[in-house]
Every structure is written in C-alpha cells, then in structure tokens.
C-alpha cells in the first residue's frame, strides 16, 4: 500500500505530555522534579510549536520570565501547553504553561510558566528565515501578544546595561564551576546542543552554588532570562 502524504495543519499551539519519573528528581530529599528538567520539557514543546508554525528548523534564542510556582512530584503526569504569542520576521515568541496532575485524580494545576523565543533557520545555510505572521483572533490572544511585545524593550534595555558592565575575578560573591560532557543524545540534528539541555546544566550549576552557600536544600523559583 503506497504512503499517502498528508499536509500538516499550521496550528499556533502544541501540547506535549511527559511522565515525571524518579530520575527527574535531581537530588535525594528534593520535593519534586528539578527546574532544569522542567525547562527541558518546555524547550521540547516550544520547539514543536515553532517548527510546526514555521515548517522549518528552529533554534532557541531566548528563555525568560520563568516562574516556578510549585514542585512537580515524581509520578505526576506533566502537560506543557505552548502557543504562539507573536511573530517577528524570523522569530516566534511562544508562551508556555506547565501543569501536572496525579494520574489517579486527573486534576491539572499550574506549576510553571515562561516565554521562549525561537528563530527559524534555513537548514542548509543556517541563515534566518521569514516565518508566517501570526494574527491574534480574539481578546485573549491580543492580550498575550501585547504582553509579549511589551517585554521586547525591557529585554533590550537590560542587554544594553549588561554589555556596559565590566566583569572581573575581583569579587567576594560565591561562585562555582561545573563542567558537562555534551553527549550525542544532547545534540539536535542541526549539530548544536538542545537549548533545554543547556538550561538543565545551568539549573544544576545554580543549585550547587546556592546549596553550597546556604548549607540547605534550595529550589528554583524564578529565572529572569537566558539568551543563546
């Protein structure tokens, strides 16, 4: 029987589900899944949303406004809802909501939300590609689009201030250096480490730094922004 080609619908939203397993909990005694693993799940769902909309290869450009509102226990079903908020010439601003539920109850409640920006790339040249414009169709979509657009100026102002700073080793601030080996499974078909994997590494290093300084167990509650 010959294969039949079916055109994929260009939808502005994607929902992926994951099962939170014991191996997703970073250290013994933690109340739930590590923040880095949650960010990895978000990156996968947001990538699926971006690739579906643009119909091409995409790369993570920015992740920010990350709010962790509660821990996700091992054994929960995790649902990541990603949708286009607005588009630029080659960029797609995607809002993401993470919810989880005890499978015995099936009641999903929010655990995290954040914004991810992807850029569409030509898989052959690596240059950015134009994407279809997203036009909000109702009041809620317009509200989300306006909120996403309002953050652009703030991000640029922060980046400008950071570029003007001079960073040296003359500091008493606590610091820690972690090294990771990028495995073949960490690399996407474009030849680069997945953005979600890089975010998981950042979370692990941050966790080690805060626990060493405080002498207590710590959890991620907020991340202002990660630019790739």
Labelled PLM ranges:
Residues 1-33, 145, 149-201, 208-215:
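Catalytic strand-loop segment that frames the active site of acyl-thioester-processing enzymes
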Residues 37-41, 45, 197-201, 205:
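Short amphipathic alpha-helical face segments that pack within enzyme cores
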Residues 29-33, 38-44, 51:
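N-terminal, Lys/Arg-enriched amphipathic/low-complexity engagement segments
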Residues 3-5, 9-17, 72-77, 85-158, ...:
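HotDog/MaoC-like acyl-thioester-processing domains
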Residues 40, 76, 80, 124, ...:
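Short alpha-helical basic/polar micro-motif
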Residues 22-23, 60-65, 69, 128-131, ...:
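Generic secondary-structure boundary/loop-capping signal
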Residues 42, 66, 96:
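Conserved GNAT-family N-acetyltransferase fold
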Residues 9-11, 46-92, 109-114, 204-228:
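Hydrophobic beta-strand-centered segment that forms part of the acyl-chain substrate-binding groove
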């Amino acid at each position: 029987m010959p294969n039949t080609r079916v055109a994929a619908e260009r939808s502005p939203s994607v929902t992926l589900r994951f099962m939170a397993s014991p191996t997703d909990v970073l250290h013994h005694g933690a109340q739930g899944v590590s923040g880095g693993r949650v960010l990895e799940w978000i990156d996968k769902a947001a990538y699926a949303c971006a690739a579906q909309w643009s119909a091409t290869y995409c790369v993570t450009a920015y992740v920010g406004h990350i709010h962790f509102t509660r821990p996700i226990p091992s054994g929960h079903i995790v649902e990541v809802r990603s949708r286009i908020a607005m588009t630029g010439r080659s960029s797609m601003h995607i809002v993401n909501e993470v919810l989880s539920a005890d499978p015995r109850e099936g009641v999903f409640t929010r655990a995290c939300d954040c914004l991810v920006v992807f850029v569409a790339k030509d898989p052959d040249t690596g240059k950015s590609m134009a994407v279809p414009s997203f036009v909000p169709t109702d009041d809620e979509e317009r509200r989300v689009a306006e909120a996403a657009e309002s953050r652009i100026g703030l991000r640029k102002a922060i980046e400008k201030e950071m570029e003007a700073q001079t960073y040296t080793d003359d500091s008493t601030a606590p610091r820690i250096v972690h090294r990771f080996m990028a495995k073949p499974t960490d690399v996407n078909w474009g030849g680069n480490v997945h953005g979600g994997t890089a975010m998981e590494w950042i979370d692990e290093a941050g966790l080690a730094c805060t626990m060493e300084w405080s002498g207590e167990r710590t959890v991620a509650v907020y991340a202002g922004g990660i630019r790739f």
